[in-house]
């Protein structure tokens, strides 16, 4: 199959939301420019990469950029990150570069309606013409939260961290801004001019916003926006993983689901929640605080949720308790739907797992597992349905998931 995989591999400075002794450092307060590359070469069968860091952001585009859309992390709610007729990654050249932005970028750029949109940790949102790089609009959504106001963390300040999402049907950009004095606002912006359509608080009920971090990419399904939360770098305070959803027009009551753990269990993978063709929502859960190996605490797991956020099913590896003790959790990378009703997931331990989406299998109930990454998997993965390009710490690694679910 001809095509290009786009995999976001987060550097060690960007993946510390679930606390690792070997992962540290936050970005500087000054922001990077945006660079956009294009090519006139034909499509290639090799895998391409797109990396976002505090130093640089690059988006690969086709020769007709006005027609390109990349609506969220991995392009769509299934996070596949696969472009069937994309450019040759080996023949890219820089087309334009923006002026310096006002803060660090942790989320992927999104592309829709001839615009490239990015959001910074200073709560600024910028839109550029995708063909020329000319600024289209810029809006600031409020003062961000300084590191000094938080018990722990490694982003200073914290504003917009998770990748936004676009509803192409209404040309609306959705993102979450962390604003003073300590509140997460879901903001809906007009893609054409940056005007605010509406904004509402989406802090998980009963949890302290100053201990929750909105790092995961936003998701749209079932006419709702889904927002996931984990903890700060250092795992301080009484945080728990959570999901909150709101209707696309901001109306009605929010729906929510909180990981049923005593503490922790963050949903911190930058790739965010994944949605399958059934409409079910899949989440990967990081370490939870358990002291009893015989009492599963819903940490180091993949959960299947209905669109109304009712929990249906869960899976965890047989060594879930050991993974928690070694801070080698699954939360570092999100679930990835494959063809045939399967789910691929990996984590800090570098092991890849294939699950049955319709029956996750409980503890140790995966269809297959294999060592995939040296140094762990972080960020996100991409797939054409069977070949999976995993965002490993040392660089993208491609594996094949066979008809028997085995990984090779």
Regions found by a protein language model. Give the residues of each.
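Juxtamembrane proline-rich low-complexity "stalk" or linker regions positioned immediately after a signal peptide
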Residues: 27-53
């Amino acid at each position: 199959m001809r095509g290009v995989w786009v995999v976001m591999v987060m550097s060690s400075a960007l993946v510390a939301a679930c606390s690792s002794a070997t992962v540290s450092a936050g970005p500087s307060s000054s922001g990077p420019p945006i660079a956009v590359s294009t090519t006139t070469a034909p499509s290639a069968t090799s895998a391409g990469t797109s990396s976002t860091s505090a130093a640089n952001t690059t988006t690969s585009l086709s020769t007709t950029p006005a027609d390109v859309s990349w609506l969220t992390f991995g392009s769509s709610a299934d996070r596949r990150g696969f472009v069937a007729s994309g450019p040759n990654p080996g023949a890219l050249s820089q087309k334009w570069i923006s002026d310096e932005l006002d803060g660090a970028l942790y989320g992927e750029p999104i592309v829709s309606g001839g615009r490239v949109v990015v959001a910074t940790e200073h709560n600024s949102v910028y839109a550029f013409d995708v063909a020329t790089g000319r600024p289209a609009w810029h809006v600031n959504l409020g003062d961000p939260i300084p590191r000094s106001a938080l018990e722990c963390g490694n982003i200073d300040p914290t504003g917009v961290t998770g990748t936004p999402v676009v509803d192409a049907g209404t040309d609306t950009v959705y993102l979450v801004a962390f604003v003073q004095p300590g509140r997460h606002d879901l903001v809906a912006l007009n893609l054409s001019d940056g005007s605010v359509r509406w904004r509402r608080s989406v802090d998980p009920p009963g949890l302290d916003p100053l201990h929750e971090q909105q790092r995961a990419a936003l998701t749209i399904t079932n006419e709702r926006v889904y927002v996931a939360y984990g903890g700060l770098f250092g795992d301080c305070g009484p945080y728990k993983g959570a999901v909150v959803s709101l209707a696309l027009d901001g109306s009605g009551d929010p729906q929510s689901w909180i990981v049923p753990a005593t503490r922790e269990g963050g949903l911190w993978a930058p790739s965010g929640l994944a949605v399958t063709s059934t409409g079910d929502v899949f989440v990967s859960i990081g370490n939870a605080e358990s002291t009893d190996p015989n009492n599963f605490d819903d940490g180091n797991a993949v959960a299947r949720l209905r669109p109304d956020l009712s929990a249906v099913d869960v899976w965890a590896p047989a060594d879930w308790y050991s993974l928690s003790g070694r801070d080698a959790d699954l939360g570092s990378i999100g679930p990835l739907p494959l063809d045939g009703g399967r789910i691929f997931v990996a984590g800090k331990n570098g092991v890849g797992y294939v699950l049955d989406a319709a029956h996750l299998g409980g503890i140790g109930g995966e269809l297959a597992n294999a060592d995939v990454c040296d140094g762990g998997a972080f960020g996100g993965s991409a797939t054409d349905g069977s070949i999976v390009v995993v965002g490993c710490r040392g660089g993208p690694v491609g594996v094949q998931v066979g008809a028997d679910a085995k990984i090779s």
